[in-house]
Amino acid sequence: MKKMAIACALLSSVVASSVWADAASSLKSRLDKVSSFHATFTQKVTDGSGAAVQEGQGDLWVKRPNLFNWHMTQPDESILVSDGKTLWFYNPFVEQATATWLKDATGNTPFMLIARNQASDWQQYNIKQDGDNFVLTPKASNGNLKQFTINVGRDGTIHQFSAVEQDDQRSAYQLKSQQNGAVDPSKFTFTPPQGVTIDDQRK
């Protein structure tokens, strides 16, 4: 009986691993169908009790695997741009721009996962698929991300995604008017405006 229980446990583990692998493959395959796009987005952040913390909106341009421009326009403007090597974060309000190497950027944030769509990133998660919804749970428990959910159609269109942190704060993003196709290369370059303080962390 004990051997039977052990065998069943091992089988369950193998089946679960297979399901997670299939879900990861399906997610990557769907995202691979669109190499570049532009979309507008709305953001809603709620705390652990469900109370609203912040609402915002902006524009997103992506050219996989390493070019992207995340432009938050409301409530406060901020810009996150990758030119393929350097990751720039610019906050016009405080007039400061931070530069880091893209290769050193964390791969466990929802946006980086979507923009890079690398198999090595998805392997860090247990992934379950329910139709167009994919629920990702980090295999490691030492990060701030508790769960990540993304809704992406068979044609590669991302409809929405959300992230739940360890303190149960939830950030939900809804993408609208996704336009697939070539994106102006200038969207993936950034030149700090004159007078802006630059924090260059590319060491």
Swiss-Prot record:
Sequence segments annotated as region (Disordered): 178-203
Alphabetized UniProt keyword annotations: Chaperone, Periplasm, Protein transport, Signal, Transport
Keyword Signal among record annotations: yes
InterPro entries attached to this UniProt entry: LolA/LolB/LppX, OM_lipoprot_carrier_LolA-like, OM_lipoprot_carrier_LolA_Pbac
Compartments where found: Periplasm
A Gene Ontology cellular-component term: outer membrane-bounded periplasmic space
Record's keyword annotation contains Protein transport: yes
GO biological process, one term: lipoprotein localization to outer membrane
Signal sequence interval, chain numbering: 1-21
Domain of life of the source: Bacteria
Protein function: Participates in the translocation of lipoproteins from the inner membrane to the outer membrane. Only forms a complex with a lipoprotein if the residue after the N-terminal Cys is not an aspartate (The Asp acts as a targeting signal to indicate that the lipoprotein should stay in the inner membrane).
Annotated family: Belongs to the LolA family.
Quaternary context: Monomer.
HAMAP family registered for this protein in UniProt: LolA (MF_00240)
Name used for this protein in its record: Outer-membrane lipoprotein carrier protein
